[in-house]
Structure formats: structure tokens, C-alpha cells
């Protein structure tokens, strides 16, 4: 039985993700993506108006993979926290260009900058709540003030300032 062919739009997203992770978002153009896929730039533009639209869809996909992890109930064991952190870091690695090129991407797209800042706050909140749960259950010890100094301010996303 033959596999059904992947749709062009999905292939554009997969190729874009791979290129941006490998080369860095600022170094990838829509022409590079089309060349990598052996399609015409017009075919790419049929599916996406510009590179920022592609980035927006990639961010949507990233957010969908992370959202269920943020809804995780408080951990009962330290291993649960480590597992959650492992899953979060796997997702971050899969979409690593978003973090590596965060300033560049968010400086061009205010709406995305706001969404990124919100997600970073939710990530921080989830990890802090899981840590507090472990402290309450006696599974982990923490100082009076378990937050990192860097966590005392909102995520540093230039476009949100």
C-alpha cells in the first residue's frame, strides 16, 4: 500500500522548520525554502504570503505541542517534574530557532511577541507550581524564595516593552 503524498503546505512547514533550525531564521529566505523543496517560489507564495506567515504557523504548532504540558497537574514525585522538564526541552529543541532568534522574530511581529511573552510566563508559572507542589509534599527542599532572580521580571521580549 502506497503512502498518500504529503501536502505541499505541510512540506513547506517541515522544510522551513528544518532550515531555520539549521541555518537560523534570519539566514533563511522563502527562496531558500522553495529551492530546498524543488518547488517554484510562486507555489510557496500560493500557500504562504511571506516568511512571517510561515513562522506564525510554526509557532502555532509549537504552542499546540506545549499547551498540554502546561495543563499538567502538580507533580507528586521529583521524577514527574524531571519528566515534564524533559518533555518541555524536547519541544523547545524541536523548535529551537524560535528561542535562538527570538529577538529578531519578535522585533518584526508584535502580535507574535505578545504570544511568546505569554507562553514564557505560562511555562514559568507551571514549573514554579510543580516545584512548589514538590516542596509542599516534602519531596523537595527550597529556600524561602525559590524563584530565580531572572524570573522576577517578565520575559525580555523587545517588542513587548
Model-predicted segments: where are they?
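Short, hydrophobic secondary-structure boundary micro-motifs
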Residues: 100-102, 115, 142-144
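Amphipathic alpha-helical packing segments from all-alpha helical-bundle domains
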Residues: 111-137, 147-161
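N-terminal intrinsically disordered/low-complexity leader segments
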Residues: 1-7
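Hydrophobic alpha-helical connector segments
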Residues: 57, 70-98, 107, 112-114, ...
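Helix-turn-helix
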Residues: 11, 15, 19-53, 57
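Short, basic, alpha-helical segments at the C-terminal edge of helix-turn-helix-like DNA-binding modules
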Residues: 60-66
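Short helix-capping/turn signature of helix-turn-helix
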Residues: 48, 104-108
